[in-house]
Regions:
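Short active-site oxyanion
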Residues: 25-29, 128-131, 178-180
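Membrane-embedded transport module
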Residues: 152-205, 224-418
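Cytosolic catalytic regions of ATP/NTP-dependent phosphoryl-transfer enzymes
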Residues: 1-102, 108, 121, 134-146, ...
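Short, acidic loop-to-helix structural element flanking the phosphoryl-transfer center
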Residues: 109-128
């Protein structure tokens, strides 16, 4: 039968109707949609080709069938029809979905994707609360939510009508325990998003239809479907999922956490290194009278680092590894941590503690290198320099080497603040490996080529001072490993 007219599906009505022409004097009206919504527009029902009255008496049986299907996670679609003798006018179209004859229902299985179950489980372990908002029957929604692991014992599922009866204040109070919303309207979605935001939560909302646009716009992160999503939904969203897969959202969260962690690593590395440099210079100035008296060196010569040393460390030693940390893979526990609160700053208690103690550690080790260097008893003879000047250059060289190489090795400490470097290893980031290798190689070039040694005022070190320098370079790894072992490298909230 040719289709003469169509009333498209509407999320408020939850119905769709088509009018078909049989002949000039006979038209058929077919309606399909939600069981409750359709039954409200039916006055009769049909069994085995026989149309019967008293639909009210039969509704109980229909509801039982509906619940049975819904409990099996089937999406139930009810159908009805009626016959009319003329093509309805536009005015009549508004009332055409009345006095229908109910003919039955069909249950359609729409199994959740396997990756969706895994994604929901990942969200749960990551401290992300997953909420289902659907137009399905409540029983169907509950069955699917339980299968996915969204709804657990003690958590609530409510309908749009129940939500309608709540004030926004009441919804805000209850929202943290509600995991499923069934038979909701577009306005309800906006209310749900705002209720979560009232608790200070960052809310991501997925949607594909025109009616999802307000909620997508209201959410902190609106995610529209790229395949089935409407243009209106895509315009309102911040992110478009090209594969329409919820698991992609979870993967994006994981990648976001990796990027955030790597930014933190780079900041911690740079600041702890800079604190180390400041400590060396500050205490050297503070101790200048003592060091001059103790080792018989003129006060004007007490200088642990030359300007060229500081420039080299800041521009070469620090910058390359800091940039390469951006490519670090995610830590194993990245999706087992609670989300960072929006109000939390980058400088948490744990990070501040690590920057301070690791900076002091690097600084004091470098200062120790300077003191050991200027205490050299029989320094080599260098033409044009006094013994005191040679001892100072040895101290400066040892400080320069310890500061530069200890910072390079310290990068591996920073990659994981909880697990031992011997457990995490030094692999997994080729860019970091090459960055550290390049920085180390450039340092060795300076130490090996006489012309560059002269520019950087670097003498050849006695063998005992070389051994002591290597020991001081390795020391940061040992100290941080002890801190990790004693669980004092992190704060309680990490």
């Amino acid at each position: 039968m040719p289709r003469a007219y169509e009333i498209p599906f509407d999320s408020d009505r939850k119905l769709m109707t088509t009018v078909h022409k049989v002949n000039d004097n006979q038209y058929m009206v077919y309606t399909k949609g939600g069981v409750d919504e359709l039954l409200a527009r039916c006055s009769k029902y049909q069994i085995n080709g026989e149309v019967r009255e008293n639909l009210e008496e039969y509704k109980k049986k229909i509801d039982e069938f509906n619940d049975q299907m819904a409990e099996n996670a089937l999406r139930v679609l009810a159908m009805a029809y009626k016959q009319i003798d003329h093509m309805p006018s536009k005015e009549e179209m508004e009332t055409i979905e009345k006095d229908l004859i109910y003919i039955g229902m069909v249950g359609m299985i729409d199994p959740p994707r396997e990756e969706a179950k895994v994604a929901v489980a990942k969200c749960k372990s990551a401290g992300i609360k997953t909420v289902m908002i659907t137009g399905d029957h409540k029983v169907t929604a509950v069955a699917i939510a339980k299968e996915l692991g969204i709804l657990e014992d003690g958590e609530d599922a409510i309908t749009g009508s129940q939500l309608e009866a709540m004030s926004q204040e009441e919804l805000v109070q209850r929202v943290e325990n509600i995991r499923v919303y069934a038979r909701v309207s577009p306005e309800h979605k906006v209310r749900i998003v705002k209720a979560w935001q009232a608790h200070g939560e960052i809310v991501a909302m997925t949607g594909d239809g025109v009616n999802d646009a307000p909620a997508l716009k209201t959410a902190d992160i609106g995610c529209a479907m790229g395949i089935v999503g409407t243009d209106v939904a895509k315009e309102a969203a911040d992110v478009i999922l090209t594969d329409d897969n919820f698991a992609t959202v979870v993967s994006a969260v994981e990648e976001g956490r990796r990027i955030y962690d790597n930014i933190i690593k780079a900041i911690q590395f740079l600041l702890s290194s800079n604190v180390g440099e400041v400590i060396v210079l500050f205490f050297a100035i503070l101790l200048t009278p003592f060091l001059a008296t103790k080792f018989g060196i003129p006060i004007g010569l007490i200088e642990p680092l030359l300007p060229i040393h500081i420039l080299w460390i800041n521009l070469v030693t620090d910058s390359l590894p800091a940039l390469a940390l951006a490519f670090d893979p995610a830590n194993k526990d990245v999706m087992k941590r609670k989300p960072v609160k929006a109000s939390s700053g980058i400088f948490t208690k744990g990070m501040t503690w690590r920057i301070i103690y690791q900076g002091i550690m690097i600084g004091l080790l470098s200062l120790a290198a300077f003191v050991i260097g200027i205490s050299t008893p029989n320094p080599p003879v260098i033409e044009g320099l006094t013994q005191e000047q040679v001892r100072v250059e040895i101290g400066q060289t040892m400080t320069f080497i310890v500061l530069a190489f200890s910072e390079l090795i310290h990068v591996f400490n920073i990659r994981n603040n909880k697990e031992s470097i011997f457990k995490t290893g030094i692999g997994g980031n080729k860019q970091l490996f090459w960055a550290i290798g390049a920085s180390a190689m450039l340092m060795l070039v300076i130490l090996a080529i006489p012309v560059l040694r002269a520019i950087f005022s670097i003498p050849v070190l006695p063998m005992d001072r070389i051994v002591e320098t290597i020991e001081l370079v390795i020391a940061p790894v040992v100290i941080v490993e002890i801190f990790k072992l004693l669980k004092i490298n992190t704060s309680k909230d990490e």
